[in-house]
Design a protein with these regions (language model features):
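Conserved beta-strand positions in repeat-built beta-propeller and related beta-rich domains
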Residues: 30-36, 71-80, 117-122, 156-164, ...
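Beta-strand-rich domains and repeat architectures in extracellular enzymes and scaffolds
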Residues: 10-37
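Structural motif
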Residues: 38-40, 78-84, 125-126, 164-170, ...
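Blade-level signature of beta-propeller repeat domains, shared across WD40, Kelch, NHL, RCC1
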Residues: 191-217
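Short loop/turn segments that connect beta-strands within beta-propeller blades
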Residues: 43-47, 87-91, 129-133, 173-177, ...
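Surface loop/turn motifs at the tips and blade-to-blade linkers of beta-strand repeat domains
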Residues: 10-15, 52-56, 97-102, 137-142, ...
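Blade-loop segments of beta-propeller domains
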Residues: 49-66, 73
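Repeated scaffold domains used in trafficking and secretory/extracellular systems
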Residues: 17-22, 57-65, 102-111, 140-151, ...
Length: 217
């Protein structure tokens, strides 16, 4: 059976080239530019930048975590990956810094208690404890370019970057012992990061320098 395609609600110009990280904090979008190494706080109703922040590296991914945010940051010289805590009032914490397993990892999601980190080339999502130890491995079966929790379920972009990029959005129930990953719809652009604002999903079309709002069919 051929999958339907996502329903785009809107495309908006990114305030900076190569939009990469994206998170919804309940009121605003937080976008991280890969090329400029900057973080932008966006009012989605007026589509204007409220603040600009400088992270300690490349902001590969972000997720909101109960009033703070976590960013996957690639640090020089080898783009080693760390999860860094960010508080809007005080900025990035030097103490609260988690080393990603094998210094690799990209996208983040949060279930209200634990962080989940995906590893692109290992086709998996890892559930981490507070110190960054792996407490669970969920096989996704393909490269992962974003994931987010909605109603206790994980929604995930999976596919391949090769041969022109081919992606679907899929769903799985992390409460299952061996979650079955079910594809829902085709994503017809090179999607990077996935977040949900309570009504619609959001992602970055990085190569087009656009941020996309969409719904499921």
């Amino acid at each position: 059976m051929k999958l339907p395609t996502i329903i785009e609600r809107g495309r908006f110009p990114s305030p900076a080239p190569a939009p990469q990280a994206l998170a919804w904090d309940g009121n605003k979008l937080w976008m991280g530019s890969r090329d400029l190494r900057r973080i932008y706080v966006i009012d989605p109703k007026k589509w204007e930048v409220l603040e600009e922040k400088k992270p300690p590296g490349i902001p590969w991914a972000a997720v909101a975590t109960n009033g703070t945010l976590r960013f996957t940051i690639g640090e020089d010289p080898n783009d080693d990956r760390y999860i860094r805590r960010f508080a809007p009032e005080t900025g990035f914490s030097e103490e609260d810094k988690i080393t990603c397993p094998e210094f690799t990892g990209s996208y983040l999601s949060y279930d209200g208690t634990s962080l989940f980190l995906s590893q692109w080339y290992k086709h998996r999502i890892l559930k981490l404890d507070a110190k960054g130890n792996i407490i669970r491995v969920i096989d996704i079966g393909a490269e992962v370019s974003g994931h987010t929790f909605v109603g206790g379920m994980i929604y995930v972009f999976r596919g391949t970057e090769q041969n022109g990029e081919s992606w679907t959005i899929a769903r799985l129930d992390p409460r299952e012992e061996k979650p079955k990953v079910k594809d829902i719809a085709i994503v017809p652009f090179a999607c990077r990061s996935l977040t949900f604002d309570g009504a619609n999903f959001w992602s970055n079309h990085r190569t087009a320098n656009e941020i996309v709002s969409f719904a499921l069919p």
